[in-house]
């Protein structure tokens, strides 16, 4: 589990470097015009996610944040690089087989989704209100953690719950003598959605609300969810 946590922290640190670099490069550019026609765009928001099947069979909801930065070709066309993190809360159904195997109810777990994406955004912007569509793709890494290590026996039937936690099945049975406390899977995926903006301050701060569908073919269980993001754009 320590290795998984170290890997997750490393991924977050790399994401920080990726999105901090554009700010460092522009830090000394005092002549940059940061009005409505600025070439730089940034965003930071809180995301509450609704999982879709098959992910919804294993998680109730997700919450986290989204941060991004990019380049505006014009007032309508832009590219945006984003990092999304969501903490995934497991359902009771996905915990039950693990609790039965350990003969205790004192077992919990959680998952994390990390996504690095490059996106195209088309926006129609008025003086106060705006709307946009956004779509792109990138790399999605998802993991799952148990609060206790689990060693499988020889009579456990394979159900989606075992697959969610990373166990391997064979001929309808969970393969015996596996010991796991965490697992992870990475895959390239796509996303698409739309949002609305409201100008809230000068020079060009905008409050935004966005819904976006994300899909990635992670091993054992595909990642499909819709984060509803509320935040500030600049």
Regions found by a protein language model. Name each.
Residues 1-37:
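Cleavable N-terminal export/targeting peptides
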Residues 23, 27-73, 79, 226, ...:
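Short glycine/proline- and aromatic-enriched beta-strand/turn motifs that initiate or cap beta-hairpins
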Residues 30, 63, 70-156, 201, ...:
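Gram-negative (and chloroplast) outer-membrane scaffold detector with strong preference
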Residues 34-42, 75-79, 127-133, 186-188, ...:
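Outer-envelope beta-barrel architecture signal
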Residues 38-40, 59-65, 110-116, 129, ...:
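Residues that define the transmembrane beta-barrel architecture of outer-membrane proteins
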Residues 44-48, 65-71, 118-122, 135-139, ...:
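Residues on the lipid-exposed face of transmembrane beta-strands in outer-membrane beta-barrel proteins
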Residues 51-55, 101-108, 176-182, 214-218:
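Extracellular loop and loop/strand-boundary signature of outer-membrane beta-barrel proteins
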Residues 92, 182, 195-234:
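Predominantly the C-terminal beta-signal and adjacent terminal strand-loop region
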């Amino acid at each position: 589990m320590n290795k998984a946590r170290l890997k997750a922290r490393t991924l977050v640190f790399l994401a920080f470097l990726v999105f901090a670099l554009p700010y460092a490069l522009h830090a000394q550019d005092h002549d940059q015009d940061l009005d409505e026609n600025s070439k730089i765009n940034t965003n930071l928001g809180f995301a509450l996610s609704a999982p879709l099947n098959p992910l919804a069979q294993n998680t109730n909801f997700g919450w986290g944040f989204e941060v991004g930065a990019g380049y505006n070709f014009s007032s309508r066309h832009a590219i945006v690089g984003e990092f999304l993190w969501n903490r995934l809360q497991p359902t009771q159904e996905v915990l039950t087989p693990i609790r039965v195997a350990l003969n205790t109810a004192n077992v919990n777990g959680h998952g994390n989704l990390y996504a690095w994406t490059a996106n195209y955004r088309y926006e129609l912007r008025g003086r106060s209100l705006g709307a946009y569509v956004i779509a792109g793709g990138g790399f999605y890494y998802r993991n799952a953690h148990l609060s206790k290590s689990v060693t499988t026996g020889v009579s456990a039937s394979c159900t989606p719950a075992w697959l969610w936690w990373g166990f391997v099945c064979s001929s309808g049975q969970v393969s015996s003598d596996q010991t796991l406390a965490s697992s992870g899977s990475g895959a390239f995926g796509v996303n698409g959605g739309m949002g609305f903006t409201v100008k809230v301050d000068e020079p060009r701060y905008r409050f935004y609300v966005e819904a976006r569908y994300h899909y990635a073919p992670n091993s054992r269980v595909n990642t499909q969810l819709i984060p509803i993001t509320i935040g500030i754009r600049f």
